[in-house]
A protein has these predicted regions:
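Class I SAM-dependent methyltransferase Rossmann-like catalytic core
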Residues: 1-31
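Conserved class I S-adenosyl-L-methionine
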Residues: 35-44
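Glycine-rich SAM-binding Motif I of class I
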Residues: 46-50
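Class I SAM-dependent methyltransferase SAM/SAH-binding core
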Residues: 52-113
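Short conserved loop adjoining the S-adenosyl-L-methionine
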Residues: 113-120
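A conserved beta-strand element that flanks and buttresses the S-adenosyl-L-methionine
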Residues: 127
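Hydrophobic adenine-recognition pocket in adenosine-nucleotide-binding enzymes
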Residues: 131
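A short, conserved alpha-helix within the catalytic core of class I
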Residues: 134-144
């Protein structure tokens, strides 16, 4: 099975949601600044954008990185519409899109190599769901 297909990634969203701890999410949201810098390693379909909005994060900067160009193209084409259907105000531009006041940009490439470039002064949140099991953890921790 190819785990980098839009159909597979969308199908597993509900399973991923049920696997998340509400207590951990609430602790995260309590410590996240009002205008967070978020880096999503192995961003896939950029579902983190929808999750952030659903959790009340409507401002900040989101940067997603994925090695699979077709997945990033799919995310760019579909995530703004998904957010719009969920009631968000979405504005698209050539570089990405805004969901409410959350500026969203996606890049194709090696997530570990590009992670620090997104926010040279550091990110407030690094998301790496279903990613850290695919890379060397020590290499990942060295860049975050």
């Amino acid at each position: 099975m190819d785990h980098a297909t839009p159909r597979y990634l969308h199908a597993k969203e509900s399973v991923d949601e049920r696997a998340r701890s509400r207590r951990v999410r609430d602790l995260l949201l309590d410590t996240l600044p009002e205008d967070p810098r978020v880096v999503d390693l192995g961003c896939g379909t950029a579902v983190t954008v929808s999750n952030l909005r659903r959790w009340g994060v409507e401002r900040g900067r989101y940067r997603g990185i994925d090695a699979a160009a077709p997945i990033v193209a799919h995310a760019r084409a579909t995530r703004p519409t998904i957010c719009r259907r969920a009631g968000a105000t979405v504005a698209e531009d050539p570089a990405g899109w805004r969901v409410d006041d959350l500026d969203c940009r996606l890049r194709v490439g090696d997530a570990l190599a590009l992670a620090r470039e997104q926010f040279p002064d550091g990110a407030d949140l690094v998301v790496a769901q279903a990613f850290l099991d695919l890379v060397d953890v020590d290499d990942a921790l060295a860049v975050v």
